[in-house]
């Protein structure tokens, strides 16, 4: 297969010896044609850089976009177009240990159990700058972070909806999947999971605090998801299996809408079919963002009661 190199944003291809496929095709919002501001969000340990893409006018609802593990905020640029069409200001955030935001003391990912605090700070930033409601977008581990935010944030009542792409719904499932891929004996894999969640495992894992994997099992906690959620997940995802997303949607059909893609690797659903991805997101979000009626309030044109 031959691919044309259209542009080099950084580095020297003559000296490159290795590379990888990324789903991000733009280095920043400006390269995608969006006017953006560089902003800093106060978080634990300092300031986290973010891109702010204003929708214009007085946008009441902001989309806060959370990239996945090992990725950067570039991953979220693909969602800015649909957000703007819906009148949403977009805030593409960084979080602890992602290489942009301040590192945590232990320098380790918390799999969502700690990173959600930085998204909470982003919500506070949005509210201080005119937002009244929030939509969360999350990719991969960013989806796990969004779920934790919707569960634990002091602003959770202001989170109108979530759009999750290839989210981690159950870390035990993902860790077991990777143990199998890497031919790690199941007993060793289970021991590793135990050490993640046990105080005595800190010396082995380097984590400042245990990670409560059960608290992040949204298959078991399916009925506790009370924020309308769209999950987009490829059946061919090689990194985060789509099975838990399916089960979550089945167990909480009232709140969770599930859309599958084919032939897309992890978080690359948009890359396989951007038109469908964007259409799904816009069609699902529009009714979620519609004005809420107060009890007894009639929409214009409704017949009066008893008429």
Task: Enumerate the language-model features and the residues they cover.
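Short alpha-helix in the alpha/beta-hydrolase fold that links the catalytic acid
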Residues: 227, 241-250
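N-terminal cap/lid segment of alpha/beta-hydrolase-fold proteins
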Residues: 6-57
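Acidic catalytic loop of the alpha/beta-hydrolase fold
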Residues: 235-240, 267-268
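Hydrolase active-site cap/lid region
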Residues: 151-211
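Short, surface-exposed "cap/lid" segments of acyl-processing enzymes
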Residues: 44-49, 53-96, 100-102
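Catalytic histidine-centered segment of alpha/beta-hydrolase-like enzymes
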Residues: 264-278
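Alpha/beta-hydrolase active-site loop
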Residues: 108-129, 135
């Amino acid at each position: 297969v031959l691919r044309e190199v259209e542009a080099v944003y950084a580095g020297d291809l003559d000296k490159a010896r290795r590379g990888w496929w990324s789903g991000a095709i733009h280095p920043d919002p400006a390269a995608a044609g969006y006017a953006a501001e560089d902003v800093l969000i106060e978080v634990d340990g300092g300031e986290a850089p973010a891109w702010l893409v204003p929708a214009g006018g007085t946008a009441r609802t902001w989309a806060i976009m959370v990239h996945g593990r090992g990725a950067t905020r570039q991953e979220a640029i693909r969602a800015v177009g649909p957000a703007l069409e819906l009148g949403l200001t977009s805030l593409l955030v960084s979080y602890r240990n992602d290489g942009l935001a301040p590192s945590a003391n232990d320098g380790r990912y918390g799999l969502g159990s700690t990173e959600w605090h930085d998204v909470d700070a982003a919500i506070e930033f949005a509210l201080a700058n005119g937002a009244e409601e929030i939509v969360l977008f999350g990719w991969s581990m960013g989806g796990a972070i969004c779920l934790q935010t919707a569960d634990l944030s002091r602003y959770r009542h202001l989170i109108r909806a979530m759009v999750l792409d290839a989210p981690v719904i159950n870390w035990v499932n993902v860790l077991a999947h990777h143990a199998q891929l890497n031919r790690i004996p199941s007993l060793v894999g289970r021991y590793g999971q135990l050490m993640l969640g046990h105080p005595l495992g800190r010396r082995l894992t380097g984590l400042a605090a245990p990670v409560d994997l059960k608290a992040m099992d949204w298959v078991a906690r399916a009925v506790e998801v009370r924020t309308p959620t769209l999950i987009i997940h490829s059946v061919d995802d090689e990194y985060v299996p789509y099975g838990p997303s399916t089960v979550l949607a089945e167990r909480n059909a009232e709140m969770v809408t599930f859309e599958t893609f084919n032939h897309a690797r992890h978080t690359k659903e948009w890359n396989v079919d951007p038109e469908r991805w964007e259409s799904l997101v816009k069609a699902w979000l529009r009714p979620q963002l519609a004005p809420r009626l107060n009890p007894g309030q009639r929409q214009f044109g409704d017949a009066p009661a008893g008429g």
